[in-house]
Amino acid sequence: MKKVEFFMLLLCFIAASSLVSADPPTCPADLGGKCSDSDDWQGDFFPEIPKIKYEGPSSKNPLAYRWYNAEEEILGKKMKDWFRFSVAFWHTFRGTGGDPFGAATKYWPWEDGTNSVSMAKRRMRANFEFLKKLGVDWWCFHDRDIAPDGTTLEESNKNLDEVIELAKELQKGSKIKPLWGTAQLFLHPRYMHGGATSSEVGVYAYAAAQVKKAMEVTHYLGGENYVFWGGREGYQTLLNTDMGRELDHLARFFEAAVAYKKKIGFKGTLLIEPKPQEPTKHQYDWDAATAANFLRKYGLIDEFKLNIECNHATLSGHTCHHELETARINGLLGNIDANTGDAQTGWDTDQFLTDVGEATMVMMSVIKNGGIAPGGFNFDAKLRRESTDVEDLFIAHISGMDTMARGLRNAVKILEEGSLSELVRKRYATWDSELGKQIEEGKADFEYLEKKAKEFGEPKVSSAKQELAEMIFQSAM
C-alpha cells in the first residue's frame, strides 16, 4: 500500500514539475485546444490559418483571395481604398449560432464560458489576430459586445475602459482601428421601450450616458464614424404611443450627440442605420427616405449620413441598390453594412453577400459616389448556425470580400464600356431639349406647359428597353 502511495505522490510531483517548466500556453483554435484563463495570455488563436493572400481567379485555395487584390489600382484608387473592409466584432466573436428555437452551436476553443473582463480581453486579442491574418484594417463594435455590462453605469464604464486600453495597446504598430463604434441600446431590459424614445425619462438619461461613453472610446481609438441603430426606437402599437413626442425626443437626443461630438473634437461622421422592424414592430428610421425626411424636418441633414445595410433594405421592401441610390442622391451615403437577406424569409438573416449581380449594383452606386470614405464596408454578417469550424470564419469573410471585388471589377467594366449609360441617356434625351431645360431650371409654369402641349399634340412614348439594359448588365458578369 505504501508503494502505491509513494508512486502516486511521485506522479503528482512529476505533473507539477511539468506545469512549472512548460512553455507559455497557446490557444490552438484549429486543434481543439484550451486557453489559459490568465489576463496576460499571449498565444496564437489561429495557428493553422496562414495570412490570407491574393492568388488570382484560378486558385482553388479556400484560404486565399481570388478577386480581391488589395494593392491593385482601379480607376485611380487602390482596391483596399474602394472598400475599407471591416469585421463586425459582434457576429464574428460573440455569435453563438443560437436562435429562438435552439441553443448555441459554436463553441470556439478560446471561450471559457464566462462573460468576464478577462474573457473580453482574450476575445479582443483574437480579434486583432483575425484582422491581421485577413489583411483588414478596420473593425466595428457595440460597447457591450467588447466588455461586460456591470451592475452600475460606473462599473460598466470601468469594464469598458479596461478592454479599450488593451485595444489601444494592440493597435500600436498597425493601421488597425475602428471603422465605427456604437452603443448597444436594445439588449438590456431597461431599453424594452427604447432608449431615446423611451416613455421613461430615466431610461433616456441612461441611454445618453451610455452613448456619451461609447462616443468617447470610439474617438480614443481613432474611430472614423459613430453609428446609431434604433432597434427599439419605434413602437408595437400606436394605441399607447405618442409618436410625435417620441420623434421630438429622438431629435433632441441626436442634437445632444452632435453637440458632444464637437465638444470632444471627434471628427468622424455620425451615421444613422435605417431598418424597418425587428425587434420593434415599426422602427422610426424605416428606410433611407424616412431617415432623410426625419433629418430634414429637425435640421440635422448636414450633421448625419446613413449606414445602409443590404438586409435591412430587403426587410423594407427595397433592393440594396435602391437604398444606396436614395442615400447617394440625397448626399447621405456614408457607410455600407455588406450583407444580404433571404427574400423568402421575413427576418434579418445577416448572410454574407455572395451574389455577384447584387455586388455589382452596389459598386455602381459607390463609384458614382466617388467612394465611401471615411465610411467603408462592414461585414455585418454571421456564419450559418450549422457552420461551426473556426476556418469557416475566414472562409466567410474571404468569400464576401471576393464577391465585392468582383462587383467592383464588373461595375467598372459596365461604366467604361458605356452601353448602359448610353441607353439611359437616350431614354431621357427629350429632356435635353429647350423645353426640358426650362422645366429643370424652374422656368416653365403650367400656362406655358399647356401652350406647349397644344403645339406638340399627342406625345410619342419610347420603349424603356429594360430587357436590353438587363442584357448589357448580365454581359459584364
From Swiss-Prot:
Q: What class of enzyme is it?
A: isomerase
What SUPFAM superfamilies does the record point to?
Xylose isomerase-like
Among InterPro entries, the record links this protein to:
Xyl_isomerase-like_sf, Xyl_isomerase-like_TIM-brl, Xylose_isom_bac, Xylose_isomerase
| Cofactor or coenzyme needed | Mn(2+)
- Tell me which EC number(s) this protein carries: 5.3.1.5
Q: How is the cofactor bound?
A: Binds 2 manganese ions per subunit.
Highest taxon listed in the record's lineage? Eukaryota
Q: Tell me the residue numbers annotated for binding Mn(2+) 1.
A: E273, E309, D337, D380
Pfam families in UniProt: AP_endonuc_2
Query: Which chemical reaction does it catalyze?
Result: alpha-D-xylose = alpha-D-xylulofuranose
What Gene Ontology terms describe what this protein does at the molecular function level? Answer: metal ion binding; xylose isomerase activity
UniProt keyword annotations, A-Z = Carbohydrate metabolism, Isomerase, Magnesium, Manganese, Metal-binding, Xylose metabolism
Q: Where is the active site?
A: H142
Q: Which positions are annotated as binding Mn(2+) 2?
A: E309, H312, D348, D350
Cellular component GO terms held in the UniProt record: endoplasmic reticulum; Golgi apparatus; plant-type vacuole; plastid; secretory vesicle
- What's an example Gene Ontology biological process for this entry? D-xylose metabolic process
Similarity comment: family membership: Belongs to the xylose isomerase family.
**Name this polypeptide is given:** Xylose isomerase
